[in-house]
Amino acid sequence: RVSVGFTNQEGILKNSDFKRVTAALNLNPSFFDDHLTMNLNAKGMYARSAYADGGAVGAAVKMDPTQDPYNFTSEYHKAQFGNALDQTLQNYGGFFQWSSAASLGDSTWPFIYNSTAECANPLAMLAFNTEVAHSRAFVGSADIDYKVHGLEDLRLHLSLGADVSKGRQAQNKSTASPSAMYYGSVGGESILKRNLSLNEYAQYYKDFNDNHHFDIMGGYEWQHFWKSTNSDYVGRYPMTNDDPTLAGTERPHTPYQYKTDSYLVSFFGRANYILMNRYYLTATVRDDGTSRFKDHWAWFPSVALAWKAKEENFLKDISWISDLKLRLGWGMTGQQAGEKINNYNWIPTYSV
């Protein structure tokens, strides 16, 4: 089975939208008279999101409705700018802004957006703030089950899984943007995640007669979680900097990069015995290992008894009881995930 999907959604604000393409493939082949069965799945996704500056909504409420958003038409502004009107309008990217005299030390920027007015031009906010995110994801799995020829009570099972995703977000504020006027800003970040898993086990079923059932299972599980984060945002020196040779150049900045991974490995076993389809005995044991703790390995046993009372003769004919089963169990559990548990807490750190 194959499926493909496409979404194209226009945003509420200008220059915002969402596009997504998805594809999925599912195969269920079987071989050797259904002794070997497979379930293969693959899903892929690509999405592009363009974000608009949400502050434009509030700015639109505050904006003077009589003011031309693309020009300075009042006598007040003509007198304020004088001969610098055309240059200021060009600096603002052709948009009106409430302004004040600049102290940038740059003769080509005599005026700058007056942030104390708290009334930026909403159209300029939407035009000069660009933020786009790209997301890619792939999820794949393969389940393979084999019923051994000549020993059909024995099954071998293998599961493989992969979950890979990558997100990249870029932001660019023009020098004409009221939130980064004159200086502008540019930057972005990307995150790559990769989770891999393997699960394999053997399971043996045996019905000795109508009253006795026994099954046992043993297996191995492996998981790897990996994540890489990169980000970099660039600022610039102002024209008023003490060293004029630095004016307009990038400030020193160190790109942020962080990688982390962890492993989870398990050996497990389980045995079930059922007597007369009424009395159940279950025992399990796991030997789990995680890279998140200094003591990597721990045992987790459990045992349970159950009585399916509905199968007893004195309850079978009571119609208002559809099922009744009593269970008593004991076990130990562990936790290697949590808000205060990260991959490297147990490793000492040193500062030089």
Please describe what each predicted stretch is:
Residues 1-24, 32-36, 136-138:
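Outer-membrane beta-barrel translocator/receptor signature
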Residues 20-21, 26-32, 41-46, 54-55, ...:
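Extracellular/periplasmic, surface-exposed regions of secreted and cell-surface proteins
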Residues 33-83:
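N-terminal, post-signal-peptide soluble/periplasmic segments
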